[in-house]
Amino acid sequence: MRNLKFYICVLLALAILAGCATTKFDVVSKPGTDLTKCDNFLVCSNIEDAVFKADLESRFVDKLTANGKKAVEGTKAKSDSGSDYILDVKLLSSSIKLDHKKIGPAFPVSFKLEIGESHEVTEKVTMSFDISVTDTKTNEMIFRGTVTSDSEESTEAGCVNAIFSSVASNTVKKYFVK
């Protein structure tokens, strides 16, 4: 019974860790630019899939508004949104890597022969984004960066969900709020 509790704790810890995404930044910005002082954003994305596009834009809007900024999704905005800045999130690349791991015999065998084996397949999705901020008054790009994030989940949708959350959350936290 003690071993069962231990294994359950280990499985829960692995489940929590598996839902994480790592995010890396590489940015340049106009000298003197402080995005923490910017407000009122129009968030746009170039993703063709309407569901993913709306999801990514809404993640940034949610994170910005939760941190006291005004923001509207490009998919919901009219042609003149009245925004002071345009936050443009473009998908540069995405890739999926499948890992195939042997996790042991499929059933207990009393001999040294392994009659059946159990395997686990995990997906690692990596996505890179170009993120830019343009001042609508001067039509000048004041910030531009590349963000790369990856995640390992049991499904592609789970990976994309973790990546979108990580990219939006980490970008807003790192550059848009103090």
Predicted stretch roles:
Residues M1-C20:
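Sec-dependent bacterial lipoprotein signal peptides
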Residues G19-K76, F176-K178:
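A structural "domain/chain start" motif
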Residues E48-A50, L92-I96, S149-E152:
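Solvent-exposed loop/turn segments at secondary-structure junctions
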Residues A15, T36, S81:
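Structured loop/turn residues at beta-strand edges in well-structured enzyme cores
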